[in-house]
Amino acid sequence: MSFNNKTIEELHNLLVSKEISATELTQATIDDIKAREEAVNAFVTVAEEAALAQAKAIDEKGIDADNLLSGIPFAVKDNISTDGILTTAASKMLYNYEPIFDATAVANAKAKDMIVIGKTNMDEFAMGGSGETSYYGATKNAWDHSKVPGGSSSGSAAAVASGQVRLSLGSDTGGSIRQPAAFNGIVGLKPTYGTVSRFGLIAFGSSLDQIGTFSQTVKENAQLLNVIASEDAKDSTSAPVRIADFTSKIGQDIKGMKIALPKEYLGEGIDPEVKETILDAAKHFEKLGATVEEVSLPHSKYGVAVYYIIASSEASSNLQRFDGIRYGFRAEDAKNLDDIYVNTRSQGFGDEVKRRIMLGTFSLSSGYYDAYYKKAGQVRTLIIQDFEKVFADYDLILGPTAPSVAFDLDTLNHDPVAMYLADLLTIPVNLAGLPGISIPAGFAQGLPVGLQLIGPKYSEETIYQAAAAFEATTDYHKQQPVIFGGDN
């Protein structure tokens, strides 16, 4: 029996009333994963034994009636550490790495008796926008298996969209939650930088990385964020939790809310059908009582260039730890220490990871630092200031999540620049450390279109309020791909 069409609240009621047990729900989730996994390749590891053991322990002590997520399974992106469960970052470099600790976000979820069902596939070390750079093969889009699911949190999005799990965790460095959420027609939130601890997240770009949430609905997304958000002494960039309940404004109307629509977000490079869908969504927000006005974010056009200098520079530093000495893959054909380093990194990293390490090393090198890395930091400040000017007069910013719907597998992965430009609309949010959400807003060419809502720092409850108002008066989130059990 499958429970994948039940909401979290419905599952909670079934668990509390003992109509089902946590063990039965976990086994049903494992069955849902197995039934769909060959088609989507969303998981690197299904932690069947550990999950059932965790569920049994929860059943023995009893479901907590006051804890909505007690006994609920969830999936975790494979760059987020899980105690005793392989955490590979979808790389040959970490093919055998089992952490001996949980990331703080995972520990927080387990403390609320959530059950880790497995680790999801992803672009290697979170470097990619299509789910195709994984050592374990490409993840497929839940709606059309010939299309990409987006990246880098490809498996976390596809798993939720295909009905394998109800909730999952991902990470977002330049759009890696929001873009796959858009491509798969689900809800994905990147919180304000520092809201969720990065302790236990395998670092890519430390000033950009943020753990976030995937779900079927806006409310369930907020419910999961309630559990994982926390200040953490183990992460010096974590911030005090300023919002007691991220669901607090869900259900409130948005009359009088001021929403900005940047002209740059609907300009050159945006698919005409995507543009039309977003303009229709803007009109819908106006019908709900909000004011939508055009604004300008003039420096957003530099976001991709700034991001790939800063993120690659940080990656070149962060990935120095993978050297074949301490843990993970080690090349066998080494004759000396230099050979260990060179051969291990040459064989252990994929092409995209090597490309970004080289770009970052170049940007930080003597003679180029000022021209590239320092200049990128200066333009990043201008991008932040653009947002601050808009948020002085507006509550939220609205736009498409991605310039297009999901594209064909094995196309843009041969054109790095074109792939990078797919993150054009999400990258500025990371550069500014802002929260952003993608929600389903319609369809183009038979594939989901994502609507992005961006707010000032620590405005997640307002973002959820607006997103939930849109969701409650549309039915896009109710439409499901065939693999889930839908008619599409």
Curated annotation (Swiss-Prot):
It catalyses: L-glutamyl-tRNA(Gln) + L-glutamine + ATP + H2O = L-glutaminyl-tRNA(Gln) + L-glutamate + ADP + phosphate + H(+). GO terms for molecular function: ATP binding; glutaminyl-tRNA synthase (glutamine-hydrolyzing) activity. It comes from the Bacteria. The active site is at K77, S152, S176. Gene3D superfamilies: Amidase signature (AS) domain. It is an enzyme of class 6 (ligase). Its EC number is 6.3.5.7. GO terms for cellular component: glutamyl-tRNA(Gln) amidotransferase complex. It holds the Pfam family Amidase. HAMAP family: GatA. Allows the formation of correctly charged Gln-tRNA(Gln) through the transamidation of misacylated Glu-tRNA(Gln) in organisms which lack glutaminyl-tRNA synthetase. The reaction takes place in the presence of glutamine and ATP through an activated gamma-phospho-Glu-tRNA(Gln). Belongs to the amidase family. GatA subfamily. Heterotrimer of A, B and C subunits. This is Glutamyl-tRNA(Gln) amidotransferase subunit A. It comes from Streptococcus thermophilus (strain ATCC BAA-250 / LMG 18311).
